[in-house]
């Protein structure tokens, strides 16, 4: 089963992934972008080089294609539980070029069965971002991140409607423990 955690920077995805690692010890944990060695290189170029938005979008699509081919497909073949920190959903939300068709090509139409959305309000986001050093994307501001969050939700629910992906939307301001229990129950109801 292929499960993804989605949310903007500061929503608590990384915290939840770490908690899930203790609970699902046999699962394959991965991330997008950068879930492969090639992906890390592409991610570095996309985030650090002065390139066009279109070129950046294709770098992330290349990363996604390699990630699905070399990580996701083999794990699905072995019937492993795959838990990914982000997926094509974030890829489409963060990009100015959010073509579902190109993403379906890159993923070979392999989509997550379960999508966990961590949603945070403006005040919660401000508070969390004040506690960490900000990267290039986070430095674009709270309003930009809230716009991206809305796009993440839109893309997740579009996948639910078009392809039957299950979606669990959670308030990221809940305690990490409560969120973990809800996420684990959502994953376990099929595992």
Swiss-Prot record:
The keyword Nucleotide-binding applies. It catalyses: dTMP + ATP = dTDP + ADP. Its EC number is 2.7.4.9. Disulfide bonds: none annotated. GO terms for molecular function: ATP binding; dTMP kinase activity. Keywords: ATP-binding, Kinase, Nucleotide biosynthesis, Nucleotide-binding, Transferase. One of its GO terms (biological process) is dUDP biosynthetic process. It comes from the Bacteria. The keyword Transferase applies. InterPro entries: P-loop_NTPase, Thymidylate_kin-like_dom, Thymidylate_kin_CS, Thymidylate_kinase. GO terms for cellular component: cytosol. ATP binds at residues 7-14. Belongs to the thymidylate kinase family. HAMAP family: Thymidylate_kinase. Phosphorylation of dTMP to form dTDP in both de novo and salvage pathways of dTTP synthesis. This is Thymidylate kinase. The gene is tmk.
């Amino acid at each position: 089963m292929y499960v993804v955690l989605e949310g903007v920077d500061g929503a608590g995805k990384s915290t939840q992934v770490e908690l899930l690692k203790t609970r699902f010890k046999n699962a394959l944990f991965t991330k997008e972008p950068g879930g492969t060695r090639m992906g890390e290189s592409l991610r570095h170029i996309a985030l650090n080089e002065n390139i066009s938005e279109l070129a950046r979008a294709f770098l992330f699509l290349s990363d996604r294609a390699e990630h699905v081919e070399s990580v996701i497909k083999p794990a699905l073949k072995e019937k492993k539980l795959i838990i990914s920190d982000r997926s094509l959903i974030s890829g489409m939300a963060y990009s100015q070029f959010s073509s579902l068709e190109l993403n379906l090509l890159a993923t070979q139409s392999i989509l997550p069965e379960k999508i966990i959305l961590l949603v945070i309000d403006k005040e919660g986001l401000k508070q969390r971002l004040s506690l960490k050093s900000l990267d290039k994307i986070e430095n674009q501001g709270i309003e930009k991140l809230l716009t991206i969050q809305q796009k993440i939700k839109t893309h997740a629910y579009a996948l639910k409607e078009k392809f039957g992906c299950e979606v669990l939307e959670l308030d990221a301001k809940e305690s990490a423990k409560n969120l973990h229990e809800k996420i684990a129950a959502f994953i376990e109801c099929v595992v």
